[in-house]
C-alpha cells in the first residue's frame, strides 16, 4: 500500500464482533512489542465481553475495516462516564492502528466517528489517556484536531500474585 490517505468511503466503521478477536489481538500485540502498552493476552481474552455492544451501557468498541477486503485495520474503545460533578465525559481508550495504515488517516476517520457518538450520548468533552512519557508526535497529531493536555494522572501499580 502506498503512502496516500485512505478515503472515508473506503472504510467501514462498525461495532466489534467476536470474530474480530484475532485481528485486534495482532494489532495490540505489535503495539505491545514496540511501546510496552501493558497488553496481556490472557486479560484481553477474559474481557472480550466488554468489547461487545451493550445497549444499557455507554461503552462500545469500534472497528475500522477496509471495504474492499474486510481487513480490520484499526480499533478504538469509547466510553461515556458521568463525573462526580454530574457531567458526561467521553473517553477514547486503547486506540490502535495496523502498522501499514498508520499515517493514512484511518485513525482520524475512526476518531471522528467516535466523537460523533460520544457527543450524541451527551458528553461535554472527550479525553484521551496517553502514557506520560508518550510520543510527542502523538500529542502534536491530537492537537491538530483540538485535543490539548489538561491533567496529569499519577498511578501506583499493585503487585499481583
Where are these regions (language model features)?
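Conserved acetyl-CoA-binding loop-helix of GNAT-fold acetyltransferases
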Residues: 94-97, 103-116, 144
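Acetyl-CoA-dependent GNAT
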Residues: 11, 18, 29-87, 93
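Structural preference for beta-strand elements that scaffold enzyme active sites
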Residues: 89, 125-127
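Conserved N-terminal entry element of GNAT/NAT acetyltransferase domains
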Residues: 1-19, 160-161
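Residue-level recognition of the GNAT/N-acetyltransferase active site
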Residues: 66, 98, 102, 131
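Conserved beta-strand-loop-alpha-helix junction that forms the acyl-donor binding cleft
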Residues: 127-138
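Conserved acetyl-CoA-binding loop of GNAT-fold acetyltransferases
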Residues: 142-152
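Hydrophobic pocket/interface hotspot
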Residues: 24-28
Amino acid at each position: 500500500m502506498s503512502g496516500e490517505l485512505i478515503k472515508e468511503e473506503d472504510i467501514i466503521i462498525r461495532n466489534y464482533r467476536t470474530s474480530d478477536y484475532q485481528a485486534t489481538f495482532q494489532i495490540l500485540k505489535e503495539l505491545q512489542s514496540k511501546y510496552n502498552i501493558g497488553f496481556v493476552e490472557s486479560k484481553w481474552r477474559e474481557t472480550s465481553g466488554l468489547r461487545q455492544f451493550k445497549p444499557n451501557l455507554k461503552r462500545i468498541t469500534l472497528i475500522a475495516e477496509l471495504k474492499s477486503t474486510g481487513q480490520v485495520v484499526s480499533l478504538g474503545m469509547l466510553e461515556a462516564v458521568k463525573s462526580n460533578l454530574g457531567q458526561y465525559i467521553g473517553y477514547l481508550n486503547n486506540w490502535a492502528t495496523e502498522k501499514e495504515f498508520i499515517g493514512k488517516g484511518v485513525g482520524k476517520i475512526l476518531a471522528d466517528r467516535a466523537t460523533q457518538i460520544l457527543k450524541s450520548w451527551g458528553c461535554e468533552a472527550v479525553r484521551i489517556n496517553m502514557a506520560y512519557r508518550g510520543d510527542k508526535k502523538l500529542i502534536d497529531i491530537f492537537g491538530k484536531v483540538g485535543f490539548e493536555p489538561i491533567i496529569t494522572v499519577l498511578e501506583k501499580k499493585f503487585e499481583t500474585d
